[in-house]
């Protein structure tokens, strides 16, 4: 999908860029039977307490029911549309099975309207088809990867993401995959994945341009802790502009920030990770 840069007619549009949806999307109205109302939570829990900061005030959305399991086996489906989904960075495609059922799936890169796709154990290695990892050859790019058999896709679902199959264990229980982050891990061979790369890979190259676009998405401003009062943040207080007064930066709740590992050491899936993801610089 192409990126269109706007003319600098105002300060807000000076560096703004947008995705040119007309070049890729079909422009159809979403399927009403696969939509439901999405309630706004504004980062609050059931008690009204803020659990996620910097959220609130977004546009109304309807949630699209996307099929991450791809469990309708050996029945061909025809791709009818490629649509925008406000709830994720990737686009979605409406597919109609030969028995009449309609479902939304993640739209892979290169998929076209009218293309036929299918799920099953021994289907062809074609973009959009879904099958078990044990039946996918090494070196194939995949997305929408399950972590538990029949549990639905968990990994590689955002725009432009994918994983690559590196090899298979002799026992046949696990398949080795490399994620886009550089992490290498084992996944059960009975888990399913979809062939191809998730589309709309230019999503990360868009320049927001002005604060109002983030407010439409429900992203509120982020305030520095050093300009707060001491009661609000460990970095707060002092006369005028002051250093944080600590050996290392802290979170608003007093825990160390920047460089602290947050993964639970007792997590059972840690033993399946062969190589950790690349450290950010």
From Swiss-Prot:
Would you indicate the residue range of the signal peptide? none
Report keywords, A-Z.
Ribonucleoprotein, Ribosomal protein, RNA-binding, rRNA-binding
**Molecular functions per Gene Ontology:** rRNA binding; structural constituent of ribosome; transferase activity
Which PROSITE patterns does this UniProt record tie to the protein?
A: RIBOSOMAL_L2
Q: Does the keyword Ribosomal protein apply?
A: yes
> Quick one: a GO cellular component term?
large ribosomal subunit
User: Pfam families, per this entry?
Assistant: Ribosomal_L2 (PF00181), Ribosomal_L2_C (PF03947)
- Which GO biological process categories is it annotated with? cytoplasmic translation
Question: Which HAMAP family does this UniProt record tie to the protein?
Answer: Ribosomal_uL2_B (MF_01320_B)
Functional summary from the UniProt entry:
One of the primary rRNA binding proteins. Required for association of the 30S and 50S subunits to form the 70S ribosome, for tRNA binding and peptide bond formation. It has been suggested to have peptidyltransferase activity; this is somewhat controversial. Makes several contacts with the 16S rRNA in the 70S ribosome.
Alphabetical list of PANTHER family matching this protein: LARGE RIBOSOMAL SUBUNIT PROTEIN UL2M (PTHR13691:SF5), RIBOSOMAL PROTEIN L2 (PTHR13691)
Q: What is this protein called?
A: Large ribosomal subunit protein uL2
């Amino acid at each position: 999908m192409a990126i269109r840069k706007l003319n600098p007619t105002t300060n807000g549009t000076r560096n703004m860029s947008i995705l040119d949806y007309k070049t890729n999307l079909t422009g159809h109205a979403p399927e009403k039977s696969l939509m439901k109302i999405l309630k706004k939570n504004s980062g609050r829990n059931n008690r009204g307490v803020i659990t996620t900061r910097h959220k609130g005030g977004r546009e109304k959305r309807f949630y699209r029911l996307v099929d991450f399991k791809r469990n309708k086996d050996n029945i061909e489906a025809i791709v009818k549309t490629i649509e925008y989904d406000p709830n994720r960075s990737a686009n979605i495609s409406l597919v109609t099975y030969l028995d009449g059922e309609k479902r939304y799936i993640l739209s892979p890169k290169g998929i076209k309207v009218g293309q036929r796709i299918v799920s099953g154990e021994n289907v062809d290695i074609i973009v959009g088809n879904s099958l078990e990892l044990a039946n996918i050859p090494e070196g194939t790019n995949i997305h929408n990867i399950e972590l538990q058999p029949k549990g639905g896709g968990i990994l590689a679902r955002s725009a432009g993401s994918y994983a690559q199959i590196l090899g298979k264990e002799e026992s046949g229980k696990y398949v080795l995959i490399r994620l886009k982050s550089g992490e290498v891990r084992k996944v059960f061979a009975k888990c399913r994945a979809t062939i191809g790369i998730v589309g709309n890979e230019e999503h990360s190259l868009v320049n927001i341009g002005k604060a109002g676009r983030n407010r439409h998405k429900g992203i509120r401003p982020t305030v520095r802790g050093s300009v707060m009062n001491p009661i609000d943040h460990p970095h707060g207080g002092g006369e005028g502009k002051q250093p944080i007064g600590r050996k290392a930066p802290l979170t608003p709740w007093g825990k160390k920030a920047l460089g602290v590992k947050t993964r639970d050491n007792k997590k059972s899936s840690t033993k399946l990770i062969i190589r950790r993801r690349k450290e950010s610089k």
